[in-house]
Amino acid sequence: MLIKGEATVAQHTGSHYLLSTLPQWDLFPAVLRGKIRLKGSNATNPVAVGDVVVFEAEVAENVQDAPMAEMVTAENPAVITSIKPRNNYIIRKSTNLSRQSHIIAANVDRAFLVITIDYPQVKLPFLDRLLVTCEVYNV
């Protein structure tokens, strides 16, 4: 049986994602449908932590009332079919010399900056860059 729903990206590693349906926070695995990855984007990865996504999952008939974490497994992950519009995001330039960017997090409500007083020394330009990024992207 095919089920569809919305979930929030809680973690991503390479092409593997962990999604969560709020408010339960049941984490379940997902992969990205190929055509989404190919859309014209200058980001290194089209999906970021915090994105709200639409997914489809093929589950057995006898487990349809179980939590998502029990219905969807790593052997049979959900498929992310689309990404909902973002409210905001935090971005940085990619580490290579290309013109790509890396979206660190999406739909961020608050940003907390925790730094050390003495060691390791915090560089003030890094602090400035983070604060300006949060202001520019409405975090």
Label the predicted regions.
Residues 1-124, 135:
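N-terminal accessory targeting/assembly segments
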Residues 125-131:
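Charged helix-capping and loop-helix junction motifs
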